[in-house]
């Protein structure tokens, strides 16, 4: 009697498909080799180690397309199983694909995105020397990189998406620029709308000229908000940064680059990103894998006093006074009539002229957002006492402060023009010393 021979082939095939359906991440990859391609039709994606980020194609709604067709983009998003998909990077934001046809592949040591007619719509355009073969890789931190076969260092890339931010700053990304002029300036630029990733009206950019560096939020070319200068611990105009216990802020200022970045410390379950929204707010957003709902941790401009130059020169904004704009002691409204009508943008003027000598004094204002630094000079070698003496000798000096607040304070910042865009905080601000006429120091 012949026995029954089990059909193991069909059993293994069935088991394979069960595993594929239940555990798709087991078969996911984070690399793209020269003989591979990602296409819209294949619906294939790259998934980062740790399953946090995913790279692939996505489309926006047809109402954003003048010709009524779908617009397709190559992007990176958080890989979550529920909720609204959150995009953190878009390759071809200003050059969409149409007709549901697009291909990403490696060609001549560069990543190239081709449309339906095999015309490039986006490319990394690498022009250096590369050792073939070249591989593209989506890293655990969300950085999409291109590296050659002889690169052994984990942080050496031919090209990386972190050098080309869109509207989102992730941990380990940088905003700023190289001092030698090489590379692009790294800024955040909003989407045109919540469903249109093309370049929008708002940007967040680091001022890298001179010795003091601060971020500006711009609406096209118009300044909307200023963070205040970096003071060794945080940006002076963001006191709440001192309460960001799980975020390590880093500011790099050397002969190679000027840049800001951050990392999330001690709790890798928390995911954090900075986002320049299409409505004009710089947002700090957090979420966890266990609770995928997004939490708006912080957003600015936060209030009226955050608005750029809302009170004009020689005036400061205080959310705890009415009106919120106040002339500095020793100054009066430049236009009293407009001031009474709550139009305070003209600011204030001195009630008594400076004598440019020993007759002048200094008014200490505590918990302040320091004035705009475009008219400031810096001397890192001296402290506050020497800074005061230097300001006394300079008839153009209008005020001074410490450059760095660490270890009791160091460095000298001295203003030689109008003092503008100031505000007073309850806590977390900085001491500012304003030069005033002796008559203004007499108790009223």
Curated annotation (Swiss-Prot):
Coiled coil: none annotated. Gene3D superfamilies: Bulb-type lectin domain, Hepatocyte Growth Factor. Disulfide bonds join 387-412, 395-397. Glycans are attached at residues 43, 125, 180, 243, 396. Residues 356-437 form the PAN domain. Pfam families: B_lectin, PAN_2, S_locus_glycop. SUPFAM superfamilies: alpha-D-mannose-specific plant lectins. Stigma. Keywords: Disulfide bond, Glycoprotein, Self-incompatibility, Signal. PANTHER family: BULB-TYPE LECTIN DOMAIN-CONTAINING PROTEIN (PTHR32444), S GLYCOPROTEIN (PTHR32444:SF89). This is S-locus-specific glycoprotein BS29-1.
